[in-house]
Each structure stands twice: as C-alpha cells, then as structure tokens.
Amino acid sequence: MIELNPVRQRITDLTDRVLSLRGYLDYDAKKERLEEVTRELESPDVWNNAEYAQNLGRERSSLEKTVGGIASVLDGLADATELLELAESEQDEDTALAVVADLDKHQAHVEKLEFQRMFSGEMDNAAAFVDIQAGAGGTEAQDWAEILLRMYLRWCESRGWKTELMEVSGGDVAGIKSATLRVEGDYAYGWLKTETGVHRLVRKSPFDSDNRRHTSFTSVFVSPEIDDNIDITINPADLRTDVYRSSGAGGQHVNKTESAVRITHIPTNIVVACQTGRSQHQNRDNAMKMLAAKLYELEIQKRNAEKDAVEATKSDIGWGSQIRNYVLDQSRIKDLRTGIERSDTQKVLDGDLDEFVEASLKAGLAVGSKRVDA
C-alpha cells in the first residue's frame, strides 16, 4: 500500500491554491455575471441585436471557463478525499493510485487557472492584430516573414482561435513583404503581446546558389483591437443633483419655481446644468443628455490616448529590439529575453510556441525588456 499522508497533503495544497484563485479571479462576481448573461441569452428578444447577442455569447464562454473550471476542480478534490478514505479503509492500492492519477489532472487544471493571473491588463481579453513586416534582405527576408506568418497561424489554430488575414503584400520572388493578421479568442492579445519585437533568422539560404549563410530580420507588432462601440451607462449613485431657480428669460417660471437642474458626475467631476425647459423634469432630461454626451467624449479621448500609446510603442521597435534568434543550421531557437532555448526548430516553426510565450508572460515581459546573453 502506498503512503497516503503525502497524497492527503497534496489534496490540501491544491484545495488551498484553488480557494486562493477564487478570490484572485473574482469567482463570486463572475458566477453572478454568468447567471445574468445566461438569463439574457435565454430571452427571445436578445437576437434583435445580433452583434450584442454574439458578444454576450463570447462573454458567457469566457465566464464558463473560469467559473466552471474552479467548481470542477473543487468537486474533483472533494471526490478525491472521499476515495482516499475508501482506499485506506479497504486497503485498496488500486483506488489510491487512481486518486494520484486524478490529482495529476487536477493539478494541471489548477496551473492553467493560475496562469490566467498573467492576464491582468485591461486589454488582455481583446482580439489582437499581428503586423508582420519583412526587414531588409530581399527575397530571403520576405520568405522569413511568410514563415513567421505560417507559424502564428498554426499556433492560433492549435489554440482554437479564429484568424483572419486582413492584409498581405506578396514578395518580389517569394514570401511576403508584410501581412496583418486578426486573431480572436480567449485572451488573444494577452497571449500574443510579448511576441512584439524583431525575429532574427540565420540559415543557409535556399535562394543562394552558393548555399551561403544569410541573416534576415522580420519585425512583429501586436496590438489590441479597440472596441469602438461605446455604451455610456450612468450610475444614479454617482450623481449629485441640485435644483435652483431659473434666471433670465422664462416667462412666469422665472424665479418662482426651482425648475433649473445642475447635475454633477462625482467620479469625473463633470458638471452640467439646464434651465431652458419649462419644468424640472424636462431640464433634468436635457441635463442627462448633456452629461451622457460629455462622458461619451471623455471615453473617446481615453480610447484615442490608448491608440496613441500603442502607436508610440510600435515606433519604439527598432532593428535592435531582437527578441528571438532562429539559427536553423545549428538547430537552435533561443529567446533572448528569457533564455529559453529549443533544438526542435521545425516543431517551433510549425506553431509550437507555448513554452516561449508562457515564459515571457511569467517573466512579465513587455516591449523593450532586458535581454539575456545570446
């Protein structure tokens, strides 16, 4: 019979990790939101706005993975505890070994959930645009750009993401000069963002009749898709409303009734006022329209600032911003930021990028991160 105390301790440790995740991933709020979204999707009227319904469907899918994942692991760990007690009482080693095998699966699930903590950025769950630009070097560089495009397409396919080639400019002889790929899926931008930078290829060129070694560069830039559909929701609790007597033209209502309305939006300190209506109700309605317009403009300014920040990041990517070397004639691909190195080069170029991307995310890397020695 195997020793059971380490197995019990493992169940306890995994349970503690999941309970910690419940708080970090805001399980209770997500569960409540999942119930709301599910109820809304069950309404026959929701499909009157197909785009809105599709967005709700995507939100439900994302919420189900978190809420369902945590609940599933907790249920599994509870079952493991009961089975372990049964195995001990009956001295059944096969059952005990089955519990250990189940714990391996639960641990992998917990680690996957814990990895979601990497995606704390506001835009991490957005769709992503991947821009690929061949560097100087003619046909060799353009062929390298196409190889990278294929690599990302394969990687996205392996993750079940939806891809759309938005633009592609063919090379002079082979390959591509540039391409833009749109990627939609769970945390697409969060996963892809650390791929921004310059990718360096070293190989014996198939386009060189003398089979000489060539070095080529291609830049990759990843940006989030900014949702331009702005829904302004005003929480009544965020408003302070003052009423006062109108001044100026207004006939019999001037200085006789407090029909003028001033509304202060406390979070932004935006103040709007209206006194032209003939009733307080009318002035309040007009003031709320003015407030909604100002909040809309504020959101537009915020999103434009986000776009400007993304473009500023793009301009910072110089040809010295290398993030990964692909030295194919030595069967070596090395990430210059994390030190991760692989020798199965064809497998990587076929889209097996998880190890590189996960290491970058765990290191909290961003554009311009410090390189390790190549």
Swiss-Prot record:
It is found in: Cytoplasm. InterPro entries: PCRF, Pep_chain_release_fac_I, Pep_chain_release_fac_I_sf, PrfB. Keywords: Cytoplasm, Methylation, Protein biosynthesis. Signal peptide: none annotated. PANTHER family: CLASS I PEPTIDE CHAIN RELEASE FACTOR, PEPTIDE CHAIN RELEASE FACTOR 2. Belongs to the prokaryotic/mitochondrial release factor family. This is Peptide chain release factor 2. It comes from Stenotrophomonas maltophilia (strain R551-3).
